[in-house]
Amino acid sequence: KMLATRALRPLASLATRRPLSQLVVSVVGPDRGGLVSSVTRAIAQHDGNVVESSSFSIGPVFSMAMLVEAGADQHAALTSAVQSAVPGHSVSAHEAEECVEAPAFAAALDVSCADGVGLIARVTEFVANEGLSLSKLETKTEGAPHGGTQLFSLSGVMLSKDRVNEAKLARGFKDLELEMGVNIDMCVYDDAEAVKMAA
């Protein structure tokens, strides 16, 4: 009888296990030591598992985004616990779609030029007008090797759920180069790489 009871316990445990779903949790605020530890401890205490994360600091401000897997009924409590763990920071959470559709088009975008006002706005406006979205974007400004001019660079990944006329897009970027006096490089990913970019 004891053996039968023990054998049934794992089955009972499986039957009561909560369904899992994914949540994107973002934390933004002043950088300080132990911040990541405080956030991840709060998540773990609510049986959350950090599947993927990305963090960076700009000046004194720290930003972190995490894809968290947790019980579907734990999302509100988990978000509240993270906010309590870092009361001086802005915490937001959004339900994540479990299935990300593979894009029909994906390409890397690199822009470099002398720094100037409105560069990011103009480039991203062109990308949006072409029906593309930017899944990743990084910009920076640094001094030229021999001093004087500030150099600007932008790197990103463009995605589209629809097929794109690559020749037309390339011509558009060439026109933008001439208009703005910038260097623009576009590298189209193959299908396998496109799936990775969307993940």
Predicted features and spans:
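A conserved regulatory-domain signal marking ACT and ACT-like small-molecule sensing domains
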Residues: A4-T5, L14-A199
